[in-house]
C-alpha cells in the first residue's frame, strides 16, 4: 500500500462524508513529485481549494508521520496541472453538484421523528414539480436533512438535470460571476435545471444581493414547474433576516420537520451504520451509544468510527461494553446542552402558567408582559442569539426594545426579593439543562 493510499484511508476513517465529497478522487502525481515536494491532483478547482483550506496541514502531518519528512504540498487540478487557469475554468467548477451515492431513500432509517419528512421527500422524487413545490425540510444539525435532499437528487439524476448545492456555494458562485461580469453563465446554470436542491438556506440571512438573485431564480424555476427543495435549521417564519417575499415563497409549499430520533430509531441507525461499514458491535454497546450520545446522527457515526479505530489500533479483537465506555468517556463527559430561544419560551410559559405563543404575542396583559420580559432577559443571558435576532423572535421593533425590556426587568429584580429568588431558581434549572 502506497503512503498516499494510507493517508487517504486515514482521512476516510475520520469523516466519511467529506472523504466521498473531496478526498476520494484525489490522485498522487508520482511522476512530478519528490520525497520532499508532493503534487496532488484534484478533479476541479473547487475541490482543490477546499482541500487546501481544510486538509493541507493534516495531509502534511500524516506524510511526516509515515516518512519523517515535512513536505511541501501543491494541490493542482488534473486537467490543468501545468498551465494557467482560464476564466471559464475558474468559474465553472466553483460550485459542483456533489451527490453522495450512499444517500438514498433505501439507506435512510425511518422512524416517528422523520416519517413525514421521508414520505414527503419520496413523493416529490416520484412526482417532481407536481405534488409539493417547494419542499422545505427543517431540523437540527445532523438529523438527516441533507440525506433526504440528496436522496431526491439520486432518485432523479438519471432522468432529469439535478443541481445540488449549499447556500454558501450558491452565494460564492453568484459573487464570483458578478466579479467576472458573467451573470449569464450563472443564470444559464441555475435557471435551466429541472430540480434545484439547496442545503442550509438559513445562510442567505443578511445577504441581500444573494437573496435578490435567489428570489428571481426561484420564480423562474417555479413558473416552469421545476422542482425546488430546500433545507434549513429552522422553519421559514423564523428565518428572520430573509426578505419577506422570499420567506413567503418558502412558506407557499410543503414545510416538514425532522425531530431528533427516538431511542428505537437511534438503535436502528447505529445497526445500519455498523452494517454499511463492516463493523460488529454487540447489542449492549449499540444500546449504550443510543442512550448516552446526542441525537445528532453525525456524532453517532463518529463515535462508531472511534470505537472501531481504537479497537484496531490497540489490537482488541472483541469490543466489550467497558471498552466502549472508555473510548467514549471524554466525549460524553464534555457534552453540553445548547439552550435555544424555544427552550427559554417553554420554561417561562410553564412557570407563568401561560401558553408559549402568548409570550411572543402582542398582548399587554400584565402577567404575559412580565413573562415576556423574563424570557427576553434569560434569552440574552443563556442563548447565543444576537439582540436583533431576539427582538425579531419576540416581535419587538428593534434591539433597543430588548434593552428596554431588560432594563425594566433588572429594576424589578432589585426591588422585589421574592421575584429575585424565583429568577435564581429558573437560572438554576437552565444551568442544570446545560450541563446534562
From Swiss-Prot:
Gene3D superfamilies in the cross-refs: 1.10.1750.10, 1.10.8.60, 3.30.300.180, P-loop containing nucleotide triphosphate hydrolases
Span list, region Domain III, AAA+ region: 98-311
Gene Ontology molecular functions: ATP binding; ATP hydrolysis activity; DNA replication origin binding; lipid binding
Keyword NADP tagged: no
Region (Domain II) residue spans: 69-97
Keywords on record: ATP-binding, Cytoplasm, DNA replication, DNA-binding, Lipid-binding, Nucleotide-binding
ATP-binding in keyword set: yes
Residues given in the record as ATP binding sites: 142, 144-146
CC per GO annotation: cytoplasm; plasma membrane
Family recorded in the similarity comment: Belongs to the DnaA family.
Subunit comment: Oligomerizes as a right-handed, spiral filament on DNA at oriC.
Protein's name in the database: Chromosomal replication initiator protein DnaA
Organism (species): Nautilia profundicola (strain ATCC BAA-1463 / DSM 18972 / AmH)
Amino acid at each position: 500500500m502506497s503512503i498516499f493510499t494510507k493517508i487517504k484511508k486515514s482521512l476516510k476513517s475520520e469523516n466519511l462524508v467529506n472523504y466521498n465529497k473531496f478526498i476520494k478522487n484525489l490522485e498522487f502525481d508520482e511522476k512530478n513529485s519528490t520525497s520532499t515536494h508532493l503534487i496532488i491532483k484534484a478533479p476541479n478547482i473547487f475541490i482543490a481549494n477546499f482541500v487546501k483550506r481544510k486538509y493541507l496541514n493534516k495531509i502534511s502531518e500524516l506524510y511526516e508521520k509515515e516518512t519523517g519528512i515535512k513536505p511541501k504540498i501543491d494541490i493542482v487540478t488534473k486537467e490543468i496541472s501545468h498551465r494557467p487557469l482560464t476564466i471559464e475554468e475558474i468559474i465553472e467548477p466553483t460550485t459542483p453538484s456533489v451527490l453522495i451515492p450512499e444517500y438514498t431513500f433505501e439507506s435512510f432509517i425511518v422512524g416517528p421523528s422523520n416519517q413525514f419528512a421521508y414520505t414527503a421527500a419520496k413523493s416529490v422524487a416520484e412526482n417532481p414539480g407536481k405534488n409539493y413545490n417547494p419542499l422545505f425540510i427543517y431540523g437540527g444539525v445532523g438529523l438527516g436533512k441533507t440525506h433526504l435532499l440528496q436522496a431526491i437528487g439520486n432518485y432523479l439524476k438519471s432522468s432529469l438535470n439535478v443541481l445540488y448545492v449549499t447556500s454558501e456555494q450558491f452565494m460564492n458562485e453568484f459573487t464570483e460571476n458578478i466579479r467576472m461580469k458573467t451573470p449569464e453563465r450563472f443564470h444559464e446554470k441555475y435557471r435551466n435545471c429541472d430540480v434545484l436542491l439547496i442545503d442550509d438556506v438559513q445562510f442567505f440571512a443578511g445577504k441581500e444581493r444573494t437573496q435578490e438573485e435567489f428570489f428571481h431564480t426561484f420564480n423562474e424555476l417555479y413558473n416552469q414547474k421545476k422542482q425546488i427543495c430546500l433545507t434549513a435549521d429552522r422553519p421559514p417564519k423564523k428565518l428572520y433576516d430573509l426578505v419577506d417575499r422570499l420567506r413567503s415563497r418558502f412558506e407557499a409549499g410543503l414545510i416538514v420537520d425532522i425531530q431528533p430520533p427516538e431511542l428505537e430509531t437511534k438503535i436502528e441507525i447505529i445497526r445500519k451504520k455498523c452494517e454499511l461499514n463492516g463493523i460488529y458491535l454487540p447489542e449492549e454497546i449499540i444500546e449504550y451509544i443510543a442512550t448516552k450520545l446526542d441525537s445528532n446522527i453525525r456524532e453517532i457515526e463518529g463515535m462508531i468510527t472511534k470505537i472501531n479505530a481504537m479497537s484496531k489500533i490497540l489490537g482488541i479483537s472483541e469490543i466489550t461494553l467497558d471498552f466502549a465506555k472508555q473510548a467514549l468517556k471524554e466525549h460524553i463527559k464534555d457534552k453540553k446542552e445548547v439552550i435555544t430561544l424555544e427552550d427559554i419560551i417553554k420554561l417561562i410559559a410553564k412557570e407563568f402558567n401561560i401558553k408559549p405563543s402568548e409570550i411572543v404575542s402582542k398582548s399587554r396583559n400584565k402577567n404575559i408582559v412580565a413573562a415576556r420580559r423574563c424570557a427576553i432577559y434569560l434569552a440574552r443571558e443563556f442563548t447565543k442569539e444576537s439582540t436583533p435576532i431576539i427582538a425579531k423572535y419576540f416581535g419587538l421593533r428593534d434591539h433597543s426594545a430588548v434593552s428596554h425590556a431588560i432594563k425594566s426587568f433588572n429594576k424589578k429584580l432589585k426591588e422585589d426579593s421574592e421575584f429575585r429568588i424565583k429568577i435564581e431558581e429558573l437560572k438554576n434549572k437552565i444551568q442544570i439543562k446545560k450541563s446534562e
